[in-house]
Every structure is written in C-alpha cells, then in structure tokens.
C-alpha cells in the first residue's frame, strides 16, 4: 500500500554521496530476466545512516534535514523494498528521489530565501519555512536558497 500525500511535493533530502554502484542482482541470472526494484538515493542514505552507521532516527533525520517521522517512513520504505528484493530474488536499482548532496550547498546559502519568480533574496527567518514566505518585490512564493526548489541539483523519480 502506497502512502502518497497527494498534492504535496516531497521535501528535499540531504545525502552524503550518490551510490557507488547503480544496481545489485542475484548471481547467475541475466538482468533482463529479473524484476527490478528501485531504491531511491534518499532511501539508500537512510539505510546507510541507520543500519550501517548506527545513528538513532532523530540524529539521522537531522543529517538528512527531514523530520524524524519522515525519516522513519523513508527507512521503512527502504527496508520493505530491500527485503522484498532479497526474498523474491529481484534486482535492486539505486536511482531517483528528491535529494541534494550535502556538499552542494554552502553555509552562507542556508540562511537565505530566494523568489522562485524574480530571484529576489531575503534572509531566512528561523522557524518560518521559506515556502511560507512571499516575495516583497513580486508576491510570488519563496524557496530556500541552495535547496532543491531553487534550481540546484535535483534528481527526481
């Protein structure tokens, strides 16, 4: 059962790096004979942080810049996909998702909001998401500078 929040875009998730390999498959079976499971880059990052690095969910969520609840959903989705692929003998492809590599955003850009229409910049107010702000110049919605919505690296499904 899919829990898609209709009408609400996925928030940008921070990842340390992109996967070193693009796919895993059962040995001795041609890839074109296998069903494929797509594990998104942010799901793989959640597995890395929680299962490989041993972070608690709250710490891992902070590193990915998502809520603890969102991190839990990402991790649960990844666990189900990976377990299903292992049990049913499917190949896993690591691709897609809404993410940004942590190194792609500078510290000075994290405290700025930018207009998605005219490019006007304003200081980010703590506790107020940029997307909740409107541009004082043209009235359009603002996005976090350096975030996925501001035209930086964005890999979508």
From Swiss-Prot:
Pfam families the record matches: DUF134 (PF02001)
Family to which the UniProt record says this protein belongs: Belongs to the UPF0251 family.
SUPFAM superfamilies hit by this protein: Sigma3 and sigma4 domains of RNA polymerase sigma factors
InterPro entries: RNA_pol_sigma_r3/r4-like, UPF0251
Name used for this protein in its record: UPF0251 protein Cphamn1_1487
Domain of life according to the entry: Bacteria
């Amino acid at each position: 059962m899919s829990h898609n929040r209709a009408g609400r875009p996925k928030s940008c998730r921070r990842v340390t790096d992109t996967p070193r390999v693009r796919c895993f498959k059962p040995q001795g079976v041609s890839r074109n004979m296998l069903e494929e499971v797509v594990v998104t880059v942010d799901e793989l990052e959640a597995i890395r942080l929680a299962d490989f690095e041993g972070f608690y969910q709250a710490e891992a969520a902070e590193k990915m810049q998502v809520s603890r609840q969102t991190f839990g959903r990402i991790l649960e989705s990844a666990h189900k996909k990976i377990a299903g692929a292992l049990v049913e003998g499917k190949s896993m492809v690591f691709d897609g998702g809404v993410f940004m590599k942590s190194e792609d955003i500078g510290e000075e850009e994290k405290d700025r909001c930018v207009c998605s229409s005219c490019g006007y910049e304003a200081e980010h107010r703590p506790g107020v998401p940029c997307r909740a702000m409107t541009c004082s110049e043209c009235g359009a919605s603002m996005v976090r500078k350096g975030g996925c919505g501001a035209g930086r690296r964005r890999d979508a499904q």
